[in-house]
């Protein structure tokens, strides 16, 4: 992430936009990281890749690259996004959902920025033009001491205390729309552990 960020920053003044070719398995992680490392960019930073390699006769690489360039050249494109399978998705909202299909990525809890059909970019209207109110901001570090914990039924609440020595923060991936264990001895222990994190 930092190397990609550095290359973009080094060439930012000399280019109108950027297209980054990337493997699909970790592309959404890179897009999210770049979205926080490079904020309020009036220039587009587009990530793309393919499900099948360029040499495959049925590859999606050429179309994805073409559509990414088309999107990056559009005057209304800005910030970090993924263009893949005819869809432009905000960098902070993309998730790889399918491992075989050409429409591999979905936009989580937010509509796609745009669809690309027959050389036309059809925008959803919610992700407007860059207003230019804030200059682009570059950040040069990411705290590696952040842990993402996916809660599962029966999770041992002691895991939060075990993580406290090695991490500065824990992001809880909770049930449904934010539910955490509440009842019984396990629920109480879990909530106490959360309060210890909040108070520290």
Residue ranges and their predicted role:
Residues 1-10:
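ATP/NTP phosphate-donor binding region
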Residues 12-27, 166-180:
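Short acidic, glycine-rich surface-loop motifs adjacent to enzyme active sites
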Residues 13-17, 40-44, 75-79, 84-85, ...:
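Short coil/turn connectors at secondary-structure junctions
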Residues 20-42, 182-193:
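Short Gly/Thr/Asp-enriched flexible loops that form oxyanion-binding sites at enzyme active sites
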Residues 35, 69, 160-161, 191-198:
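Short amphipathic alpha-helical segments and helix-helix/interface helices
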Residues 47-117:
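Internal gly/pro-rich beta-alpha loop/helix module
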């Amino acid at each position: 992430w930092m190397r990609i960020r550095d290359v973009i920053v080094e060439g930012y003044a000399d280019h109108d936009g950027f297209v980054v070719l990337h493997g699909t398995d970790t592309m959404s992680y890179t897009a999210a990281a770049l979205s926080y490392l490079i904020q309020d960019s009036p220039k587009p930073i587009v990530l793309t890749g393919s499900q099948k390699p360029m040499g495959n006769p049925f590859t999606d690489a050429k179309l994805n690259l073409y559509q990414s360039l088309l999107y990056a050249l559009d005057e209304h494109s800005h910030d970090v996004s993924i263009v893949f399978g005819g869809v432009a998705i905000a960098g902070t909202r993309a998730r790889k959902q399918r491992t075989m299909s050409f429409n591999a990525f979905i936009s989580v809890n937010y509509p796609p920025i745009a669809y690309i059909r027959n050389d036309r970019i059809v925008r959803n209207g919610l992700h407007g033009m860059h207003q230019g109110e804030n200059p682009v901001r570059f950040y040069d570090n990411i705290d590696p001491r952040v842990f993402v914990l996916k809660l599962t039924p029966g999770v041992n609440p002691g895991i939060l205390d075990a993580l406290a020595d090695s991490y500065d923060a824990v992001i809880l991936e909770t049930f449904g729309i934010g539910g955490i264990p509440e009842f019984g001895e396990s629920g109480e222990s879990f909530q106490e552990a959360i309060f210890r994190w909040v108070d520290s």
